[in-house]
Structures are given as structure tokens and as C-alpha cells.
A protein has these predicted regions:
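Sequence/fold signature of self-assembling virion shell proteins
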Residues: 2-32, 40, 45-52, 72-79, ...
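Active-site-surrounding "flap" and adjacent substrate/cofactor-binding loops of secreted or lumenal enzymes
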Residues: 63-64, 69-72
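Long, contiguous amphipathic alpha-helices that act as assembly "spine/axial" helices in icosahedral shell
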Residues: 48, 73-133, 239-256, 291, ...
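Generic alpha-helical secondary structure
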Residues: 102, 106, 161, 224-227, ...
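Small/polar beta-strand repeat architecture
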Residues: 137-163, 169-226
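Glycine-rich, mobile lid/loop segments that gate access to catalytic sites or pores
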Residues: 218-240, 248-261
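Short N-terminal amphipathic alpha-helices
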Residues: 46-48, 57-62
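Short helix/loop capping segments that flank catalytic or ligand/cofactor-binding pockets
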Residues: 56-59, 87, 259-262, 346
């Protein structure tokens, strides 16, 4: 019976994962390009590898010197753990439920897991590259930036703690940086937009009186007459970052999704793809994005929605059942099922540019 219980537990895990993959949009918008084994004993670490850009050489027939491509490695920490633990009144009935992937038990377990992982992945809006956000920018006053420390001293500014994590760029900067800490209404600290190396600021000195931009500091309002323009802005962010045109996605809550369906410009694109909208909440295809509707998008209409767009290369996701079995209840008659699911996600620095965010409300 012990072996049978183990086999039933393994089948439960396999079928729940099948339902998870059928329903989770997280699986559709991420990749699993990692190396290593997930064991579940602790916070497992697997490696995410990526290569830097390659270059073409002019060939003249002479001997060539081989380039050394850069290989970047990030660690994905599988530190999210969720457990199933419930009593089994009848082992025979439980085994029957487990044998049928369409049973309410398996469907409920798989869909709950999908919602949980979707919420986790859609909460990674802080891993969007600085400069890839659409919202209401903050540009009031002027600033000076100190060399090395990245301390920003504002004049006529009203910085807030909510600005931490947003992109920052002052006149004189050649790229975007990220707000690291908030000190006061006139003082913040910025850093390079990197997570896989030690925090540093390499943007140099910016003299006082410089104009600047803090991207998407507050939410902006969208309507059916303006939503298409903001989608094109997201597309432009990815285009400028040279993100591949294929496998692009956009995830919106129903409030935004229904607004999109009212937009005159979007009706032809959505109608063309309407045959497949039931699968995983696919709303349609717009401006090169496969659009998903999902209520796990971070935020609400009061605080603002963190609508994410991107390419499958943006985020690496690992999900696994590491324990699954049936055991005798201690101190009582009967049995119980106990299973452990672990997951984690990582956006490595090289791929932050493959994500974009629209911070909005209706």
C-alpha cells in the first residue's frame, strides 16, 4: 500500500502540473532556460546563462582573430514554497480523482497553483529595465548628481519613497539609472540598473541646475481613445531595445482588457484572432503583442495597474513538485495527501531590456 500511495502521489503531482501549464500565463510569458536540478531541500539555486552580442567581421581572405564572446551567468533562487496537505476520507476515491486530469480535485489544485505563480511573476515589474516604463513622469525642479555616490540633490523637488526603483535620467547622462534609496523630498540616491553585480553608480558628476526625468513616477489615465497609443509606446520601448518581434506578450487586467475591446483601432486586430481567446485568457493580438487577460496583474484601479509587456526571454521561471505522497494520519485514522511545490523566477541584467511596464488606471 505504501508503494501504491507513492505512485498515486506522483500521479497527482504530474496531473496538477499539467493543469498548471494549461492555465498559467506565467508559463507562456517566461522561459525555462536554466541549468541545474531543483531538489526542494532548501533555497535551490540554478544557473541562467546568456551570451553577449556577437559581431560580424569583414572577410578579406587573411587570417582572422577570434572574438571572445561574453558569457553572463545569473542565479535563479527557487525560494518560493507552497504545500498541499489535506485529509483523504477514502483512498480509493482519491486514487480515482487523481487518475482523471479533468476531475475537480486536479483542476482546482492546478488552477490555484497557476494563479499563485502568475501573481508572483506579474509582480516582477521592478525588474523592467530603467527607461522602459510608461506613466506620468516627474520632472519638477532641477538636480545635481555626485560622482561615485550617486547622491541626487534636488532644488524645487518633491521626491517620494514611491519613486524608489523607478528609472532616473538627468541632462548629461547617456543612459538610464535606477533610484536606489529615498532620503528626503530633495535627496535620493541612484545606481546603475543592475542586480547581478554590486551596487554602484558610474554616471559621473552632474552639475547643479540640470533637468531630469523620473519615469512613470505616478499612474496615468487611459481611455478607449488613448490606450492604443500607449500600447504603441510600449512597442517602441521594446523596438528601441532591439527586442525580437516574435514571442512578444502583454498582460492586462479585465478592466483594461475590456477597455481595449472598446477602442476603435483595436477591434480589427482582436477580431482577427478571436478564435483562440479562450485559451489561457488570450484576448487577441495587437501591435505585435499576444494579449492575455489575467486578474493577477499587480495593482488596482485606485493605486494603478502595473501592466507588463515583454518578450519570453525577459524572465526565467522554474517550477517543480519536489515532494508528493500519501501518508497515514498521526494520532488519527485515515490518510492525508502531502505535496510540496517550489518555484522561483529571475530576470538577469542582460534581459531586463526585454520587459516594459505601463503604470495606469481607467
Amino acid at each position: 500500500m505504501a508503494d501504491f500511495g507513492t505512485n498515486v502521489g506522483e500521479k497527482f503531482a504530474r496531473n496538477v502540473l499539467q493543469v498548471f501549464f494549461e492555465n498559467s500565463i506565467a508559463d507562456s510569458i517566461t522561459n525555462n532556460d536554466y541549468e541545474g536540478e531543483i531538489k526542494g531541500g532548501g533555497a535551490d539555486r540554478v544557473n541562467v546563462l546568456t551570451f553577449g552580442s556577437l559581431s560580424l567581421k569583414d572577410y578579406t581572405g587573411a587570417a582572422m582573430t577570434a572574438d571572445t564572446p561574453s558569457e553572463n551567468e545569473g542565479q535563479l533562487i527557487v525560494n518560493q514554497k507552497k504545500a498541499y496537505y489535506f485529509k483523504i476520507e477514502s483512498f480509493a476515491k482519491f486514487a480515482s480523482y487523481v487518475d482523471n486530469p479533468e476531475s475537480s480535485l486536479i483542476q482546482n489544485a492546478g488552477k490555484v497553483l497557476a494563479e499563485t505563480v502568475d501573481k508572483y511573476v506579474l509582480g516582477l515589474y521592478g525588474d523592467v529595465a530603467a527607461g522602459n516604463r510608461i506613466g506620468t513622469d516627474y520632472v519638477t525642479g532641477t538636480v545635481a548628481v555626485a560622482t561615485t555616490t550617486g547622491v541626487v540633490t534636488g532644488t524645487g523637488t518633491t521626491f517620494t519613497s514611491a519613486m524608489v526603483g523607478r528609472g532616473f535620467k538627468a541632462t548629461g547622462h547617456t543612459k538610464w539609472y535606477r533610484i536606489k534609496t529615498y532620503t528626503s523630498a530633495t535627496s535620493i540616491t541612484i545606481e546603475d540598473d543592475l542586480d547581478d553585480v554590486a551596487s554602484a553608480y558610474t554616471g559621473g558628476d552632474i552639475a547643479g541646475g540640470a533637468s531630469y526625468t523620473i519615469e512613470a513616477a505616478t499612474k496615468l489615465q487611459v481611455a478607449n481613445t488613448t490606450i492604443y497609443g500607449y500600447l504603441l509606446d510600449l512597442k517602441t520601448k521594446l523596438d528601441q531595445a532591439k527586442v525580437p518581434m516574435t514571442d512578444r506578450w502583454l498582460v492586462v487586467p479585465s478592466k483594461i482588457g475590456n477597455l481595449m475591446l472598446k477602442a476603435t483601432e483595436l477591434i480589427p486586430a482582436v477580431s482577427t484572432a478571436y478564435e483562440n481567446v479562450v485559451t489561457k485568457g488570450i484576448l487577441g493580438y495587437v501591435s505585435g503583442f499576444k494579449v492575455y487577460q489575467n486578474e493577477q496583474v499587480t495593482g488596482d484601479n485606485s493605486a494603478g495597474y502595473r501592466v507588463l509587456a515583454g518578450h519570453k526571454s525577459w524572465c526565467t521561471l522554474a517550477v517543480a513538485f519536489t515532494e508528493s505522497g500519501v501518508e497515514d494520519l498521526i494520532g488519527a485514522f485515515g490518510k492525508a495527501y502531502k505535496g510540496l511545490t517550489v518555484y522561483g523566477a529571475k530576470v538577469i541584467d542582460e534581459r531586463r531590456k526585454a520587459g516594459a511596464e505601463l503604470f495606469c488606471y481607467v
